[in-house]
């Protein structure tokens, strides 16, 4: 569209680098299967840091990018919109909005890039990673704010409809599976 600009992402999002220096922030977040989830900061299982002072403090409406192991992992989702204040590993890129933008719109845009595997050609190094300096050059659309919000709202509604259809189908499958088991039990 004529009113849309194409800009490097650094024009609309900067990097959020605010360390949890004194360990005061305790809401531990992680990117898992394309969703930012809460984790128990007091857990004893798995690989854990000795403290969380090096973790980044992130805010609602930031966007998280997991830029590691681009050459190996071509199935997981690497982007998500942050929905709450917390801390996350500094291995991730945390994008903070610079201007009046719809973070939901940019989440959907970056998610579409993620699904199309755009990030895989951007990394470098032995483990093929990506840093903010490289990521900042990524070209993105910049429509007017009202259009960003309209697109994000439309996608929110359509995605909610699809999620409801999926939930309904899962319920139908569970019902049919129960019927199948009952039928087998009755006739055997």
Q: Predicted segments — roles?
A:
Residues 56, 60-115, 131:
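A short beta-sheet element
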Residues 1-20, 137, 145-149, 182-183:
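Non-catalytic DNA-recognition/assembly elements of restriction-modification systems
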Residues 86-91, 124-149:
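A short glycine-rich beta-alpha junction/loop motif
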Residues 47, 52-53, 83, 125, ...:
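A structural connector/turn signal
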Residues 106, 148-151:
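Interdomain signal-transducing alpha-helices
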Residues 1-3, 160-188:
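Short amphipathic coiled-coil heptad-repeat segments
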Residues 144-146, 153-158, 162-167:
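Short, flexible domain-boundary/linker segments around small modular repeats
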Residues 10-63:
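Sequence-specific dsDNA recognition surfaces
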